[in-house]
């Protein structure tokens, strides 16, 4: 009886024509979440979820594979057009955007929503290599 309640319906919604792709490119990883216009998650993927570990997660190639995976899952729901919101300073920003365009989506707008402080918290110390 408990097993019946534990079942979760997956991917029940179809035919969502347009959505928003949120690309979060940090120094350590790149996460891509594709939502509908209201912000409900349709699909997501990340470089870590694609099997990359450690410093390989922050590469542009890992971001490209993650974007292709998220795009393929979103295309199963009938998504055709995307607005892209890019956030963060990571190296996977451009490659994730190119992968979304190459997956056959019509990108209508690209926004940079990286949070920029108006002299807020003290930043972490500079790296000396």
UniProtKB/Swiss-Prot annotation:
Please provide, in alphabetical order, the Gene Ontology terms of the cellular component aspect for this entry. ribonucleoprotein complex; ribosome
Keywords (A to Z) from UniProt: Ribonucleoprotein, Ribosomal protein, RNA-binding, rRNA-binding
What Pfam families has UniProt attached to this entry?
Ribosomal_S11
**Database matches in SUPFAM superfamilies:** Translational machinery components
Q: Does the keyword DNA-binding apply?
A: no
- Give a GO biological-process term: translation
Q: Which domain of life is it from?
A: Bacteria
Q: Does the keyword rRNA-binding apply?
A: yes
A molecular-function term among this protein's GO annotations = rRNA binding
The subunit structure is: Part of the 30S ribosomal subunit. Interacts with proteins S7 and S18. Binds to IF-3.
| Protein family membership | Belongs to the universal ribosomal protein uS11 family.
Q: What does this protein do?
A: Located on the platform of the 30S subunit, it bridges several disparate RNA helices of the 16S rRNA. Forms part of the Shine-Dalgarno cleft in the 70S ribosome.
Name of the protein: Small ribosomal subunit protein uS11
Organism (species): Azorhizobium caulinodans (strain ATCC 43989 / DSM 5975 / JCM 20966 / LMG 6465 / NBRC 14845 / NCIMB 13405 / ORS 571)
- Give the gene symbol: rpsK
